[in-house]
Design a protein with these regions (language model features):
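Carbohydrate-active catalytic/glycan-binding domains of CAZyme proteins
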Residues: 1-275
Length: 275
């Protein structure tokens, strides 16, 4: 008599946020995951959750610790931190609960105040194409007050702005964010002398004549040698999202990303570059 196996459902492993390290921004080594279970664990361990979970994490170093913020469009913005990125990370903290909160990036200012910029997912919030900034507690664990809209991409031009990365350079606050769509968009730079704006805007990288579509979401990195680089992705549909590394330089207070052959201040992705 044949024996029919009885299926047993076991909790699914949901470790996430893999940490990679590099000494040259080209070759990367996997270190460890920053979270053991994607929160809330009871939700994500029960079944596969396609299109949910950790969206667009942002890592920052502040006051001797590494912080990672990410948005979960169904639950809110989370944070973990560690003094050693290759060691043990803290348990996730829900910094801001809500629907549609995505792509967070923190900034600790020179006066000790902390801020959090983020975008919004229309699939959960009912709207998108805006960037908001909120003040945070100094320890980065909670948002203080209501978010302030600092840029509205519903202007018929910069729709689908998302993935903001917030920086302070000199007297200006900068937000680097892709707009125009994941596949066909461009990199937009916003700058203001006030954290809440108003912000000037400028396109600082587009596809141009390069064979790489829509240079999308990424971040600015300064090396120990003082070189500036921009890491961003290109959406290739079923092939996935391909990472690109482009040189970044500053001209008249604006970043120029990639190759700017005509000198108009808007670069395009490089096809090849010195390592």
């Amino acid at each position: 008599m044949p024996i029919t196996p009885i299926p047993i459902l076991l909790p699914l492993p949901t470790a996430g946020l893999p940490i990679l390290k590099s000494t040259d921004l080209v070759n990367w080594t996997l270190v460890n995951p920053a979270i053991k279970d994607v929160p809330p664990a009871e939700f994500y361990s029960a079944a596969p959750r396609h299109g949910k979970g950790v969206w667009a994490p942002c890592i920052r170093y502040h006051d001797g610790e590494y912080y990672i913020y990410w948005g979960d469009p169904d639950f809110g913005i989370y944070m973990v931190k560690a003094s050693d990125p290759e060691g043990q990370w803290s348990e996730p903290v829900l910094v801001k609960a809500g629907k549609g909160l995505i792509d967070p990036t923190p900034l600790w200012d020179e006066d000790g105040k902390a801020y959090l910029a983020n975008a919004w997912a229309a699939s959960r919030a009912g709207f998108n194409s805006i960037v908001t900034i909120s003040e945070m507690s100094a320890d980065g664990t909670r948002v203080l007050g209501s978010p302030v809209i600092v840029f509205d991409g519903n202007d018929g031009i910069n729709h689908t702005i998302e993935g903001p990365k917030l920086y302070r350079r000199g007297e200006y606050y900068y937000i680097l964010a892709p707009a125009g769509g994941v596949v066909d968009g461009w990199q937009l730079a916003l700058r203001s002398k006030n954290i809440y704006g108003p912000y000037e805007k400028k396109i600082v990288m587009a596809q141009g004549s390069a064979p790489f579509n829509g240079p999308h979401q990424g971040g600015w990195v300064t090396t120990a040698a003082g070189e500036d680089w921009f890491i961003n992705f290109q959406d290739k549909a079923a092939y996935g999202r391909v990472l690109h590394l482009n040189p970044l330089r500053w001209v008249d207070g604006w970043p120029v990303i990639g190759e700017d052959a005509d000198g108009d201040g808007c670069g395009q992705p490089v096809v090849k570059h010195r390592k």
